[in-house]
Amino acid sequence: MSKAAAFLTDPPLVDDRPSFETILKHGHQDLVQAVAFNGHGDRCATGSVDGKIRVFNRLKEGIWRLCDNWTAHAGEILELQWLPTTVYPNLLASLGIEGRFKLWAEDPSAAPGRRFAESTRNGPLITIPSPRLSSHPSHLTHSQHPQQQPHHHHAPESILPSNPPPTSNPPQATGSTTAGSGAKPAFETRNPRSPYRSFSIKHIDDTRTTYLALLSADGGLTVYENDRVENLAAFSLMDEFNVLDPTAATGPGQASTAPRGQETSFRVRFDPNPDVCYTALRDGVLSDALGLVVAVQDTVKVYRTRDAVRASLGLAAATKEFYLAAEVVAGVHRGLVRDVAWAPGNIRGYDIIATACQDGFVRVFRLDTLSPSTSDTTKFAREPSSIDLTQGGELDDEKRAQESAPESRWSSSRVRRHATRRQGPSQDALTITTSGLRASLDSHNHQQTPSRELDAADRRSRRAWTNQPGQVRHTLTEISRLDNHRTPVWRVAFDDDGQILGSVGDEGKLLCYRQKPDGTWAKSSEMSVVKVKMAAPQ
């Protein structure tokens, strides 16, 4: 009896050591700016201010061991991201302060120090020209190995376009390859007009399509797609526009850039969920629609895709085009938005977006769709379309409601009337519903006129709400404002299930939050780094 009582009162001894060890000695000689884990959590990549990337592998014993180290960029590394492990198990994406986006492919047979930097040494050089949809085309440089090995996508040295802008030589690294002499990315792209400042990658398993979004310092957002996972040189331009609002000084069609010397902040993130939220599907969002959240300065914008028709070389082709679905206007964030995160797990019936602001607050927003049948015009006043204003006024409410209804069927005659009435800058990308795609293609081929060609300024418009078919109104509601850091917040991120939100501030603490039953978020745990003076060994 005493043994049973002792067993009930005193729990058995357990090992207090964690199942894994932290990377205390990362080996960087400078400040670590970016950290990324792969989908399985057994590989970690760190990027420092001196442009070096170090990759660590976690062994079965929980010990982290250095795998490779090389100089990837000429300056500090802004962001790192592993590509999906199910498709690209050994591909790492990086973005440097010089504005170059690179993909690094691992060669497991190479020696340490050259596994990523010289993963392709025997294949031919391949350069793919980028389409010119704007006044600042993005030059893509690709390299690919002719013999693809299973689970490894190797590529030889990438080449730059003719007459590239001068760049500074990267610093030499001891014990690792350099970006100028030996580091050979499998894929590389840059923007000659404005450097890239943020990127995001998403892969959809059902369609085996990979999407890449790049946000530049002038507000230009470029989205590429690749439906050939075995070929890194298959990226093609999907859409390109500007996310900055035009001002009276710049005029329509031009973005308002920040003055010289002013601090800026840019972030772009894809919707990580493989499927669209079921409530959004019910309200008319397409099942294959993409979602993007963009943070520029103190504003946050959410974009969705719709089906569109675009003229290319005199032919009309079906494509996807982004439109502004919701926006957190300037003034809500009383500082620069340093980071933004889109939560996985939209099975809850709505999406969640979190922001890290310089004013010390972590804000959590709820993203919902507004059903066309229950929309209130007094609550959400219809914004006059720029296309309608060029024709001298808005359409009447009855016709507008008929056109915006997702279940409406578009005939060929109706598409012709719509195209005639909407002679504006977006006619080469006439938006249509899924049911009327074939009719719209026929109508577009018969009614194509030179006046419907877009110039560069119109193509880079901000994609404001125009109430065209295929657009679904979204709403952003702030559900929590967390000030536990009391200092500027730099990073926010959700776990894989979207149940835990983490943030890091200037004080060096990692705070975790959980959602309460009433839908709000509250602090649940805290982790901090404490410096302890170690006693000298005797």
Swiss-Prot record:
Membrane topology (UniProt)? Peripheral membrane protein
Ranges annotated as biased composition (Low complexity): 129-149
Top-rank taxon, per record: Eukaryota
Give the UniProt keywords, A-Z.
Membrane, mRNA transport, Nuclear pore complex, Nucleus, Protein transport, Repeat, Translocation, Transport, WD repeat
Q: Which Gene3D superfamilies match?
A: YVTN repeat-like/Quinoprotein amine dehydrogenase
Q: Which PROSITE patterns match?
A: WD_REPEATS_2, WD_REPEATS_REGION
- Region annotated Disordered, chain positions: 110-200, 374-431
List the Pfam families hit by this protein, alphabetically: WD40
Which GO molecular function terms does the record list? structural molecule activity
Is GTP-binding a UniProt keyword of this protein? no
Q: Which SUPFAM superfamilies match?
A: WD40 repeat-like
**Cellular component aspect of the GO annotation:** nuclear membrane; nuclear pore outer ring; Seh1-associated complex
The main location class comes to nucleus
> One GO biological process from the UniProt record?
protein transport
Matching SMART domains, A to Z? WD40 (SM00320)
Q: Spell out the residue ranges that the record assigns to WD repeats.
A: 27-66, 72-114, 191-234, 260-313, 332-375, 484-523
Q: Where in the cell is it found?
A: Nucleus, Nuclear pore complex; Nucleus membrane
Q: How does it assemble?
A: Component of the nuclear pore complex (NPC). NPC constitutes the exclusive means of nucleocytoplasmic transport. NPCs allow the passive diffusion of ions and small molecules and the active, nuclear transport receptor-mediated bidirectional transport of macromolecules such as proteins, RNAs, ribonucleoparticles (RNPs), and ribosomal subunits across the nuclear envelope. Due to its 8-fold rotational symmetry, all subunits are present with 8 copies or multiples thereof.
Job description of the protein = Functions as a component of the nuclear pore complex (NPC). NPC components, collectively referred to as nucleoporins (NUPs), can play the role of both NPC structural components and of docking or interaction partners for transiently associated nuclear transport factors. Involved in nuclear poly(A)+ RNA export and NPC biogenesis.
Record family assignment: Belongs to the WD repeat SEC13 family.
| The protein's name in its UniProt record | Nucleoporin SEH1
Give the species this sequence originates from. Answer: Chaetomium thermophilum (strain DSM 1495 / CBS 144.50 / IMI 039719) (Thermochaetoides thermophila)
Q: Which gene encodes it?
A: SEH1
